[in-house]
Design a protein with these regions (language model features):
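The catalytic core of metal-dependent phosphodiesterases that act on cyclic dinucleotides
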Residues: 87-160, 173-182
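Residues at alpha-helix caps and immediate loop-helix transition turns in enzyme cores, especially N-
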Residues: 25, 79-81, 112-113, 138, ...
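Conserved acetyl-CoA-binding loop-helix of GNAT-fold acetyltransferases
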Residues: 42-45, 165-171
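Catalytic core of bacterial c-di-GMP phosphodiesterases, primarily the EAL and HD-GYP domains
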Residues: 7-8, 38-113
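Active-site core of bacterial EAL-family cyclic-dinucleotide phosphodiesterase domains
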Residues: 1-32, 69, 101, 129
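Cyclic nucleotide signaling catalytic output domains
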Residues: 4, 28, 32, 49, ...
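Short, contiguous acidic/charged loop-to-helix segments that flank catalytic cores in large enzymes
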Residues: 33-37, 41, 75, 158-164
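Conserved long alpha-helical elements within nucleotide-processing catalytic cores of c-di-GMP signaling
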Residues: 27-31, 40, 118, 166
Length: 182
């Protein structure tokens, strides 16, 4: 946070290199993992490593939060959701210290997703809408689904010198406050 120079939340990001100095870009790794039917196991490895690293960070900052991007297909998979809930419990992550991020461009207008969101909420796992306002249905998503946090898309905040951009951001912040988002 710029105001007090404190870190409040961290996000796990995929970085992968294999026998080279140059890392492979995350979208390429994800594409290959999906093609080889390894996407779910890869996601689990990423989450386990992120939680392991997060537990080390908690020694310095007990109030820290961790979020991980998870594709909606996995969050609509009962076995995966149960695994996620269990790993968070096993690692003794406090309720509301762990969250899943779903990008706004995810196609999540299906009836089942709300049930899985509810399971996550009931087990103290936060749900973030990532990249808010890039798509045309942002507001509808907020109306129909349970989110704890909204993360604005970076393209909104890069032009803060523009008065209209600033007003748009302020409006989104006011909307978030009205809907009790962090």
């Amino acid at each position: 946070c710029i105001k007090d120079n404190k870190i409040y939340s961290v996000e796990a990001l995929l970085r992968f290199s294999y026998h080279t100095q140059t890392p492979l870009y995350a979208p390429m790794v994800i594409y290959i993992a999906k093609e080889k039917d390894l996407f779910e196991p890869l996601t689990k490895v990423i989450i386990k490593q992120a939680i392991k690293d997060f537990n080390k960070m908690l020694r310095e900052n007990k109030d820290l939060k961790l979020s991980v991007n998870i594709e909606l297909d996995l969050l609509c998979n009962e076995n995966f959701v149960n695994w996620l809930v269990n790993i968070v419990k096993e690692e003794r992550i406090k309720p509301k210290q762990f969250g899943v991020e779903i990008t706004e461009n995810s196609k999540f207008f299906n009836k089942g997703v709300s049930n899985y969101f509810e399971i996550l909420h009931n087990n103290g796992i936060n749900i973030y809408m990532d990249d808010f306002s890039m798509g045309h249905t942002s507001i509808i998503y907020l109306q129909d689904h349970l989110f704890d946090y909204v993360k604005m898309d970076g393209s909104l905040v890069v032009n803060l010198d523009n008065p209209r951009s600033k007003e748009i951001i302020n409006s989104i912040i006011k909307l978030g406050e009205t809907l009790n988002f962090d």
